[in-house]
UniProtKB/Swiss-Prot annotation:
SUPFAM superfamilies: eEF-1beta-like. It comes from Pyrobaculum aerophilum (strain ATCC 51768 / DSM 7523 / JCM 9630 / CIP 104966 / NBRC 100827 / IM2). Promotes the exchange of GDP for GTP in EF-1-alpha/GDP, thus allowing the regeneration of EF-1-alpha/GTP that could then be used to form the ternary complex EF-1-alpha/GTP/AAtRNA. Belongs to the EF-1-beta/EF-1-delta family. Keywords: Elongation factor, Protein biosynthesis. InterPro entries: eEF-1beta-like_sf, EF1B_bsu/dsu_GNE, Transl_elong_EF1B/ribsomal_bS6, Transl_elong_EF1B_B_arc. The keyword Cell cycle does not apply. This is Elongation factor 1-beta. The keyword GTP-binding does not apply. One of its GO terms (molecular function) is translation elongation factor activity.
Amino acid sequence: MSAEVALVYRVLPDSAEVNIEKLKNDVINKLAPKYKVDKVEVEEIGFGIKALRLYIRMPESDEYSSDEIEELLRSVEGVGGYELEYFSRLSF
């Protein structure tokens, strides 16, 4: 069995007016089915702004990349920015 890679992204909306639940669903739908979103947390930033923390798992393969994930995130309406917070190889 091949190893997997775990990534954690923090995704910021482009304004406080963005519906965070809609943004969460749009991001998950954009990444699926290729990338597995294991968990999503909503984080209060301040001044009415909330961020998403995405826990993503993918196979360690040339067919999958963090560059592609970031390209998909940029294409979602309402995403103002993102940051890769954690990246680790998983193997059992």
